[in-house]
């Protein structure tokens, strides 16, 4: 019995439960990736190049010049309709806020991108699927107005499932509001660049995201209005290979360039320096 107790396999103690996982798995190829390498590679799989979703804070750190970002998005959502589905909307909001640390599905502010003054707005898919409700629409409108007033470029990184159903018509009206706000940017002849990431769908695609002077997209991003499953069921036909992915949209003229995330800032700087009226463009930059 003594020998049996000596060699009996011990179960791990509860003290190891708080030790962070060191590895993550690629959603596309299944490769095991060291987490530190994964984060340093901006959540892009080093084996197959699959672009995983990137938190809004990391996206801002990736694009804004160090030390220049000043956050302006502080609005908090309300529940004017008293909406309840399987649970009250206010409870869903509290859960998303606790999970993301954000008041709503957008993070934005003023910054410089490659020395070019800009308003940068990044949608956060982790918050209610990046859905556009009253707060997201208002923050985008205010961001566009700020860009026009201060002579800044406007850069919006989209990641959204579309309009927020819990806000009904109040959500849908944000489509018109965001589009109208862009007029002020264009009136000042300032550049507006849209970056489409996985996924960009619904009312976001059908409004401000598709109206930029230059539209960049990340590789493999799902971009469209309705999803492929809904379209397939509606038209009762098989869809083309890669339908609604960024490479397919590039081929058919909906986006201007598909850019690897690791080179996205470089591409963005080149575009902004070329288009911003207050910045002298240097060939080769």
Swiss-Prot record:
Cofactor: Zn(2+)
4Fe-4S is among the record's keywords: no
Zinc finger (C4-type): 26-48
Cofactor binding mode and count: Binds 1 zinc ion per subunit.
Domain CoA carboxyltransferase N-terminal: 22-285
Domain of life: Bacteria
UniProt main location, coarse: cytoplasm
Pfam families linked to this entry: Carboxyl_trans (PF01039), Zn_ribbon_ACC (PF17848)
Keyword tags: ATP-binding, Cytoplasm, Fatty acid biosynthesis, Fatty acid metabolism, Lipid biosynthesis, Lipid metabolism, Metal-binding, Nucleotide-binding, Transferase, Zinc, Zinc-finger
InterPro entries: AcCoA_carboxyl_beta (IPR034733), Acetyl_CoA_COase_Trfase_b_su (IPR000438), ClpP/crotonase-like_dom_sf (IPR029045), COA_CT_N (IPR011762), Znf-ACC (IPR041010)
Matching SUPFAM superfamilies: ClpP/crotonase
Main enzyme class: transferase
Reactions catalysed, as given in the entry: N(6)-carboxybiotinyl-L-lysyl-[protein] + acetyl-CoA = N(6)-biotinyl-L-lysyl-[protein] + malonyl-CoA
EC number: 2.1.3.15
Pathway: Lipid metabolism; malonyl-CoA biosynthesis; malonyl-CoA from acetyl-CoA: step 1/1
One GO-annotated biological process of the protein: fatty acid biosynthetic process
Gene Ontology MF term list: acetyl-CoA carboxylase activity; ATP binding; carboxyl- or carbamoyltransferase activity; zinc ion binding
Residues that, per the record, bind Zn(2+): 26, 29, 45, 48
GO CC terms of this entry: acetyl-CoA carboxylase complex
Self-association and partners: Acetyl-CoA carboxylase is a heterohexamer composed of biotin carboxyl carrier protein (AccB), biotin carboxylase (AccC) and two subunits each of ACCase subunit alpha (AccA) and ACCase subunit beta (AccD).
Function: Component of the acetyl coenzyme A carboxylase (ACC) complex. Biotin carboxylase (BC) catalyzes the carboxylation of biotin on its carrier protein (BCCP) and then the CO(2) group is transferred by the transcarboxylase to acetyl-CoA to form malonyl-CoA.
Family per record: Belongs to the AccD/PCCB family.
NCBIfam families: accD (TIGR00515)
Protein name according to UniProt: Acetyl-coenzyme A carboxylase carboxyl transferase subunit beta
């Amino acid at each position: 019995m003594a020998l049996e107790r000596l060699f009996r396999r011990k179960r791990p103690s509860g003290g190891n439960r708080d030790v962070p996982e060191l590895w993550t798995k690629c959603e596309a190829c299944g490769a095991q990736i060291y987490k530190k390498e994964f984060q340093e590679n901006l959540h892009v799989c080093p084996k197959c190049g699959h672009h995983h979703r990137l938190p809004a804070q990391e996206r801002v750190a990736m694009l804004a010049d160090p030390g220049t970002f000043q956050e302006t998005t502080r609005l908090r959502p309300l529940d004017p309709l008293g909406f309840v589905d399987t649970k009250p909307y206010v409870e869903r909001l509290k859960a998303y806020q606790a999970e993301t640390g954000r008041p709503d599905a957008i993070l934005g502010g003023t910054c410089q991108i490659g020395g070019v003054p800009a308003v940068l707005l990044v949608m956060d898919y982790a918050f209610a699927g990046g859905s556009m409700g009253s707060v997201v629409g208002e923050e985008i409108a205010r961001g566009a107005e700020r860009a026009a007033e201060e002579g800044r470029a406007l850069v919006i990184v989209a990641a959204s499932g579309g309009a927020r159903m819990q806000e009904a018509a109040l959500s849908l009206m944000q489509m018109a509001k965001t589009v109208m706000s862009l007029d002020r940017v264009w009136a000042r002849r300032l550049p507006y660049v849209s970056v489409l990431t996985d996924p960009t769908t619904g009312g976001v695609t059908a409004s401000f995201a598709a109206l930029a002077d230059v539209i960049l997209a990340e590789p493999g991003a799902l971009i469209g209005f309705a999803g492929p499953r809904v379209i397939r069921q509606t038209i009762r036909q098989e869809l083309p290979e890669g339908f609604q992915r960024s490479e397919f949209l590039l081929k058919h003229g909906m986006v201007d360039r598909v850019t690897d995330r690791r080179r996205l800032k470089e591409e963005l700087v080149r575009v902004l320096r070329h288009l911003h009226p207050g910045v002298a463009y240097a060939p080769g930059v």
